[in-house]
């Protein structure tokens, strides 16, 4: 089973700590969600894995081998990002042919099929594509290269709702037909919540959660009701956030829910992934504003 292991990786840009001693292992044939606020370190981590940026310390291993400046191992991964490395003067079809030279498993027929499905004009030059179709072009490349590990950094940037839904549908289909690992870094958390199997949450350059989506959602719940009753229930529990409106209060909790010992005035409900993410990544001063 192939793995990518990130070991004790740190990266600083002048005074900004982008990554702080990050360690995590990515397994094959999974769909991960890499979630974090702007500037949390998501893109830096993906750029280090793909050899576009070098860490200050630590290493990235593919099946135990160091990936840095190793072209043989780098062919096992593909990163789709906002930055383009293709000549603006080439058209889409020419880029498909060029990509085949670097990634022998690139499926040209599948790329053409997706182009038709998404309405991408393969005769257009890259510089002629709109923001949305530029993203679609990059997505088609990423879905067609057939690398064991594919990283998608803000994959649906500029896409309308119809194209986003189509992308998620195609992603699930290609994953089912040809299992491999996809890592989606996105802010559209609710849209991907039904797709991702494992969640990685990064905050201020550190991994704060890494577990299955199912397990994390099973831990999160809300308790609401009169402030005094909510406070009494939450005493000694892992409360990750709260909102107060007059005499009423909503608390966001992680852990085992115990309704048997709760005041009858309290209401319990599941915590959706987006709300859970927001509460886990709020800064202290932002959380205080909700008190």
Identify the role of each PLM range:
Residues 241-291:
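C-terminal coupling/interaction segments
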Residues 36-41:
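Walker A (P-loop) phosphate-binding loop of ABC-type ATPase nucleotide-binding domains
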Residues 50:
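Helix-to-loop junction immediately C-terminal to a conserved catalytic motif
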Residues 156-157:
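Short loop immediately C-terminal to the Walker-B catalytic DE motif
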Residues 72, 81-138:
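ABC-family P-loop ATPase nucleotide-binding domains
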Residues 26, 58-73:
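Conserved ABC transporter NBD signature motif
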